[in-house]
């Protein structure tokens, strides 16, 4: 079998799909994307395609190493996201060729189901009570919300109180009937994170995500030393080499690699094993589309340390398309009691409606995250 063609489509709300074709008629689907940089990743995918045309798609490990190492400059969000989507598609092809789901090729199931959690609220933590009530009616009991609005490097007591009050209201409304993680989204400086985490501790959030930016990862062990709340990060780390340094330093209780950013299934399977060896949990980041989610689930179901899975159904970013709008086999993604079951079809197990992909690609937006500014006019972290 040989690879013959790569085709990409930019899609609403902020996704990109990749189809890899072969001379035997088997195709694989992937989801390479950096949200807000789709055209840049698309160019990288087709540059990497020069290494792939005419090659055997079954040689996933070799092709991965060629894409990563054949260029003198490597790593980073654009290249690793391009590799990630290609890698997903190659695993999809291999599974279809062997008539087996990807989790079977990775050694078989280690669990029967995986807890899903849902985003609630928008970019800023408001109207979350109503959102949680709606999602509970859909079977969710685990959530994630933005833990604070934009925050200065040294900010006011009012800003801290606003964040804490939101969390207090959630606990008052629902008690311990639900669990929720708080995403600081890299908006918080180390001094403010230290203060905010301390104030939030009585409400026992499930985790705090990106308490500081990955660029300030040296603060993870320092912040962890002062709190019992598990700290999580990883969506802006792009290879096992970055995760190696974080694991060696300590501080994180949960790693959150993104299967569409951190090199795909091949790389994230290795990251999961590294985390297990360090007694660190795995919760893949996935506010993206159905192919990315399918890739996450295959890694979840073969990783002992996977604890829950993010998914984007109803997320505030989904303007113009929802999680399963491009999927024919929607029922395979049904959750039972807030849990995903393994995908059983060969390959990634997601049947993409190509006609709809082509149609919707004609009106794909060039999505960008908003640019925020603080009161003094300085650019704020989004």
UniProtKB/Swiss-Prot annotation:
Cofactor: Mg(2+)
Molecular-function GO terms, alphabetical: galactonate dehydratase activity; magnesium ion binding
Keyword Magnesium: yes
Keywords: Lyase, Magnesium, Metal-binding
A biological-process GO annotation: D-galactonate catabolic process
UniProt cofactor note: Binds 1 Mg(2+) ion per subunit.
Binding sites annotated in the UniProt record for Mg(2+): 183, 209, 235
Chain positions of site Transition state stabilizer: 310
Superkingdom of the source species: Bacteria
EC number: 4.2.1.6
Reactions that this protein is recorded to catalyse: D-galactonate = 2-dehydro-3-deoxy-D-galactonate + H2O
Keyword Lyase: yes
Increases basicity of active site His, annotated site positions: 258
Note: Reaction proceeds via an anti dehydration.
PANTHER family membership: D-GALACTONATE DEHYDRATASE, D-GALACTONATE DEHYDRATASE-RELATED
Function: Catalyzes the dehydration of D-galactonate to 2-keto-3-deoxy-D-galactonate.
Family to which this protein belongs: Belongs to the mandelate racemase/muconate lactonizing enzyme family. GalD subfamily.
Name used for this protein in its record: D-galactonate dehydratase
Organism this protein belongs to: Klebsiella pneumoniae (strain 342)
